[in-house]
């Protein structure tokens, strides 16, 4: 039946257009306060960065160390088994030197990507809410600016 084929083609076309219109989440645009560490004081800013990282959903952070030069954190990493199902967990760690940070992007889905000047991803965090993603971004950029000034 020609009418049924037309309806089927329209339905397929509508599904395809809907799928393609989803796209990627957009980066949140805002001006970071690069004096935040100076305004809060270094110990308070370090504690806020630690507290924010502990609330990270992915990766689940278990230990954080913040110095004037770098951010170091340990987290649980799943060991993938057959068909991608995790069979256990191991500890992993990451150290991000503030001088190596080129840019920090926070997205609408609470994902934060920390990139070097060469666009290499230095860290990737997913937070439960936009406030934690914004605070993590602001503090990293403020620590980077403070390190660049010294």
Label every model-predicted segment:
Residues 1-12:
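Bacterial N-terminal signal peptides that target proteins for export
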Residues 25-27:
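Bacterial signal peptide processing site
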Residues 34-89:
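Conserved beta-hairpin
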Residues 86-109:
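Phosphoinositide-dependent membrane-docking surfaces
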Residues 118-150:
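C-terminal partner/receptor-binding element of secreted or periplasmic proteins
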């Amino acid at each position: 039946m020609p009418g049924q084929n037309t309806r089927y083609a329209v339905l397929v076309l509508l599904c395809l257009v809907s799928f393609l219109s989803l796209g990627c989440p957009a980066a949140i645009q805002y001006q970071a306060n690069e004096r935040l560490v100076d305004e809060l004081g270094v110990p308070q800013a370090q504690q806020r960065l630690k507290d924010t990282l502990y609330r990270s959903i992915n990766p689940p952070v278990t230990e954080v160390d913040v110095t004037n030069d770098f951010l170091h954190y340990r987290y649980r990493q799943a060991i993938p088994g057959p068909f991608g199902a995790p069979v256990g967990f191991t500890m992993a760690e990451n150290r991000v030197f503030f001088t190596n940070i080129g840019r920090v992007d926070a997205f609408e889905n609470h994902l934060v990507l920390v990139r070097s000047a060469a666009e290499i991803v230095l860290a990737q965090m997913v937070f439960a809410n936009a406030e934690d993603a914004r605070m993590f971004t602001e503090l990293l950029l403020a620590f980077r600016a403070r390190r660049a000034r010294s």
